[in-house]
Structures are given as C-alpha cells and as structure tokens.
Amino acid sequence: MGKIMKPGKVVLVLRGKYAGRKAVVVKQQDEGVSDRTYPHAIIAGIDRYPLKVTKDMGKKKIEKRNKLKPFLKVVSYTHLLPTRYSVDVAFDKTNINKEALKAPSKKRKALVEVKSKFEERYKTGKNKWFFTKLRF
C-alpha cells in the first residue's frame, strides 16, 4: 500500500483543540522516532477562518474580516483524516520543524511564516475551499 500522508496533503483534525479544522501536512514521519514511537506528522492549519465579505462593506471591515489565525502541531496519524485534496504551499523546512515547535520564540517565527503563506494563498483566490469553515 502506498503512503497517504505526504507534504501538501490536506487533512482534517479529528481530536483535540483543533478538531474539525483543516490542515496541511508539512512533514510526515511514517515509522516514528525515539521520542514519538507512533506514526505522526507536523501539520499547519487554520484555527480561525476568514469571515464572509460582501461588496458593500468598507475597507477597514473587509481587512478585519479577512484575518486568519494559523496553528502548528505534531499530531498522530490516528487523529488525522486524509482527504483527496492537496495544497501546493512550500513551507521553509528550516523554520518549521520539531525543534521550532518546542521553543516559543522559534514557534512564533514559524507561525508568522505559516500565516504569511496562507494569507498570500487566500488573497490570490487559490484553494478557496481550504479557507472556508467545515460545516458539520
């Protein structure tokens, strides 16, 4: 059987604080490592989705409603539901790694990078479905 979790694959988080949120696999670890013996992945997702905007809203209101809040997390495969979709966002692997998630200052830098990549993608209008809240 082929590998399902690949970088760029869109997944749904099933458990925890971010349950029901869409995320993208940044790096996968199929066999596990010494500190985490189970298969897991580093994911970057959207915690707070942008709100709906209409043409009769002002510039300030549109700017406020277009904000999104990202998250970075190491999650076990059992808590992820892979989809058939993928998003081709190229994250910098030197900034986004397990060491960066442990140190608060590095994590902040990584989150800023993720936010900029997602906002750039959102503003260009690519992958519109990824930036909408999952209705269930």
UniProtKB/Swiss-Prot annotation:
Key words, A-Z: Cytoplasm, Endoplasmic reticulum, Ribonucleoprotein, Ribosomal protein
GO CC annotation: cytoplasmic side of rough endoplasmic reticulum membrane; cytosolic large ribosomal subunit; large ribosomal subunit
Transmembrane segments: none
Keyword Zinc attributed: no
Keyword Cell inner membrane part of the UniProt annotation: no
Pfam families according to UniProt: KOW, Ribosomal_L27e
GO molecular function, one term: structural constituent of ribosome
GO biological process, one term: translation
Gene3D superfamilies: 2.30.30.770
Compartmental location: Cytoplasm, Cytosol; Cytoplasm; Rough endoplasmic reticulum
Major place of residence: cytoplasm
Subunit relationships: Component of the large ribosomal subunit.
Reported function: Component of the large ribosomal subunit.
Family: Belongs to the eukaryotic ribosomal protein eL27 family.
Protein name as it appears in the record: Large ribosomal subunit protein eL27
Organism (species): Caenorhabditis elegans
